[in-house]
Amino acid sequence: MNHKRKLVTLIVFALLLSVTSIETGFAKPKKKKEALTGTPIMWERPNDIASRDLYLGPGGAAMRPYLRGLTFIKEEKGGWSKKYRVRDGAGREWVAKIGKEAQSETSAVRLLYGLGYLTEINYLVPRVTIPGKGTFTNVRFEARPEGWKRAGEWKWKSNPFAGTQELQGLKILMALINNWDLKDSNNVILKLRGNRGDELRYVISDLGATFGHASTTPILWRLTRSRNNPVNYAKSNFFEKVKGDRVVLHFGGKNRGLMKDISIHDAQWVGSLLSQLSDRQLRDAFRAANYSTGQIDLLVGEVRERTNELLSLRPAVQIGRN
């Protein structure tokens, strides 16, 4: 009996091995990640900074959501804020962001757009009813245009713009607007057909954690950080010191290492772009987000002050022997 049992066990084992080998041999190969083709773009030299409409932003009047006949599609997962995918009366899809980040993100997009950076298209709706979900105030509507493929995130430390002025400038702007949530998952590559063929637009998709404050002291970082808080923003620091021809910025956000090796030349370049925006344009960028007059005064004043700090930077003079 023992001999027969051993024989049966060996046969079963052999059959299992053969089935496993067949399945392995015919297993479908893993789908390779599609290589992105197109021209990478982060910033386009603007010839019209002084005349850009920072109230309507990158989408202009033509892209504004048509709120009659709004329908709910689904809840969007991920991120700090509640978000709903909706369709407007014109059949266009949007992601509606609810909560504190809506205002700050709307203004941040307009500020970047004003300087030539590529951005999402968004608008702030002061009050809207989303069927089945409720009525909300200050809701950011972010466009999901047909033909625009969201082709994954891009990395701050590994991208086609390493060492370029536009990438360094973007870092400086993130410190200027106090964006303390600098992480790769907040970035997106938008693939679309543009005037020059296929474009790969490198965009910061989530700019909600801006115009607030974050401490540079690690133990206080989570306790004191804020977003969309004009008073905190106006009280926070931007510039710390100059070391040789490098600028040390006061930045208490994630990925602080990104703020190392910022040159005076790059900082002045950002300042020169910002200085071309009029007070009216800056006010429009914040008015578009439904800030009060007092809040707009605070925010515009602080952006102006930080712009002047960038423009006034000079190399540190070292006295004594090397």
Regions found by a protein language model. Give the residues of each.
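N-terminal secretory signal peptides that target proteins for export/translocation
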Residues: 1-4
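Regulatory N- and C-terminal appendages and interdomain linkers associated
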Residues: 7-72, 88-91, 279-322
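Conserved ATP-binding subdomain of kinase catalytic cores across diverse folds
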Residues: 58-157
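Extracytoplasmic/secreted envelope proteins and their assembly/folding machinery
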Residues: 83, 105, 109, 170-173, ...
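Solvent-exposed, acidic/flexible segments
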Residues: 98-105, 162-169, 176, 180, ...
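Conserved kinase catalytic-core segment
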Residues: 104, 110, 152-225
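Residue-level detector of family-conserved "landmark" positions at structurally sensitive sites
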Residues: 122-123, 187, 296
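C-terminal catalytic region of ATP-dependent kinase domains
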Residues: 194-322
